[in-house]
């Protein structure tokens, strides 16, 4: 199967500047392609996982992945498409974050000196020495403001009469220059990114075409959300990091184990390397099999990110907590902010918050009547303080009201 065919089959494709030509070229020869990552944390999280799997797919097909971290652009902060500009990072913070990002990526792709080995570059290498007057003289005439004003990210802001800063325009130019630089010095012919990057990518493609007449391409992926519309990468308890110093392999396993039923097949295609036979099995699932599929998905993705031993350990821990400990993972779940447990909460208040009592007085009555349990142990005192010490494997608390009503409290 060709790179482009597998790219589309797995659900990665959204747009391409010239798909037919790119398909032909990637069949005939090996190319270099790049993806850029924010340099704002010491680890990537699962919001970047589709892009990482694309780099892995590139490498598996013999193409060369180039990873760009925005050390240069991080020094001026991200463009303000959001309500609040991101913190401007120091050189030391950027270097530390870059090291962590490479650790995340090294779980999935190989860095080295071979033709298809990945390389990581920091755009500060060329942007720091870029003279503004020279840049305007050498490149300014190639950028069309008319064209830039038609980009969705700009057009929508103007239509809404929202502030549009000069920095945002400059950021587009710097990203275009990144592509030009990589094309010239690293023979990079493809830029990949999320669909929100389409305008910036096209500007880079146009710049290279006008200056050097080189044939380069841009291709984007769909923005990824869960089936309920939630953004990938974060939960109520925080980001789902790829590096184990920020999130344990068990918690990583549990994130995928608890994904929505409607997402299992899609996530398996996007993020796993299960074969066609396994996909077919997933697609023909009946309701009672969905939990087995979730376990397999969680196992495969944990193995890919951490190791097979880490996946086995996570599975064993889950069995110990939820099966041998008679806690069913499929119980109704409520989410509680970690800060509340860290401060401590009265037992009767927790039962009320969790929905096991319609009022605090009813919760008190439940406890006094010996009908309330926490982690299958009877609660004797309605004022008992529940805190993080009650968390099972740092993630859940089981509450029971009587014999038939049970809830899992997750942080």
From Swiss-Prot:
Keywords: Aminoacyl-tRNA synthetase, ATP-binding, Cytoplasm, Ligase, Nucleotide-binding, Protein biosynthesis, RNA-binding. Residues 345-411 form the S4 RNA-binding domain. InterPro entries: aa-tRNA-synth_Ic, Rossmann-like_a/b/a_fold, S4_RNA-bd_sf, Tyr-tRNA-ligase, Tyr-tRNA-ligase_bac-type, Tyr-tRNA-ligase_bac_1. L-tyrosine binds at residues 34, 171, 175. It is an enzyme of class 6 (ligase). The keyword Ligase applies. ATP binds at residue 234. NCBIfam families: tyrS. Belongs to the class-I aminoacyl-tRNA synthetase family. TyrS type 1 subfamily. Catalyzes the attachment of tyrosine to tRNA(Tyr) in a two-step reaction: tyrosine is first activated by ATP to form Tyr-AMP and then transferred to the acceptor end of tRNA(Tyr). Homodimer. This is Tyrosine--tRNA ligase.
């Amino acid at each position: 199967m060709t790179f482009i065919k597998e790219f589309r089959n797995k659900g990665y494709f959204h747009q391409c500047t010239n798909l037919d030509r790119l398909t032909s070229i990637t069949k005939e020869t090996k190319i270099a392609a790049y993806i850029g990552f924010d340099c704002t944390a010491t680890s990537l999280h699962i919001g970047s996982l589709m892009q990482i799997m694309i780099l892995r797919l590139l490498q598996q097909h013999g193409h060369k992945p180039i990873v760009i971290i925005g050390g240069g652009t991080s020094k001026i902060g991200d463009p303000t498409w959001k309500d609040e500009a991101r913190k401007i990072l120091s050189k030391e913070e950027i270097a530390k974050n870059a090291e962590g990002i490479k650790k995340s990526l090294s779980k999935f792709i190989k860095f080295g000196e071979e033709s298809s080995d990945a390389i990581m570059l920091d755009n500060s290498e060329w942007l720091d020495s870029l003279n503004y007057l020279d840049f305007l003289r050498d490149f300014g005439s190639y950028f069309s403001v008319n064209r830039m004003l038609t980009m969705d990210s700009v057009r929508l802001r103007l239509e809404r009469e929202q502030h549009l800063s000069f920095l945002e325009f400059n950021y587009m130019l710097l990203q275009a220059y990144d592509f030009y630089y990589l094309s010239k010095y690293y023979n990079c012919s493809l830029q990949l990114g999320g669909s929100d990057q389409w305008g910036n990518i096209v500007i880079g493609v146009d710049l290279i075409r006008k200056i050097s007449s080189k044939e380069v391409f841009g291709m984007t992926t769909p923005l990824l959300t869960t089936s309920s519309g939630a953004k990938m990468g974060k939960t109520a308890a925080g980001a789902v990091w790829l590096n184990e110093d920020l999130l344990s392999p068990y918690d990583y396993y549990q994130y995928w184990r608890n994904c929505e039923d409607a997402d299992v097949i899609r996530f398996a295609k996007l993020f796993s390397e299960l074969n066609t036979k396994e996909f077919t099995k997933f697609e023909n699932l009946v309701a009672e099999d969905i939990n087995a599929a979730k376990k397999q998905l969680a196992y495969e993705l944990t193995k890919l990110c951490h190791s097979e031993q880490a996946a086995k350990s996570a599975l064993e821990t889950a069995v110990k907590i939820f099966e041998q400990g008679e806690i069913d993972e499929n119980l109704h779940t409520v989410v509680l902010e970690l800060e509340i447990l860290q401060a401590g909460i009265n037992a009767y208040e927790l039962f009320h918050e969790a929905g096991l009592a319609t009022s605090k007085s009813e919760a008190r009555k439940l406890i006094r009547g010996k009908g309330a349990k926490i982690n299958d142990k009877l609660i004797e005192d309605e004022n008992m303080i529940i805190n993080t010490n009650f968390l099972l494997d740092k993630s859940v608390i089981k509450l029971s009201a009587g014999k038939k009503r049970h809830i899992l409290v997750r942080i």
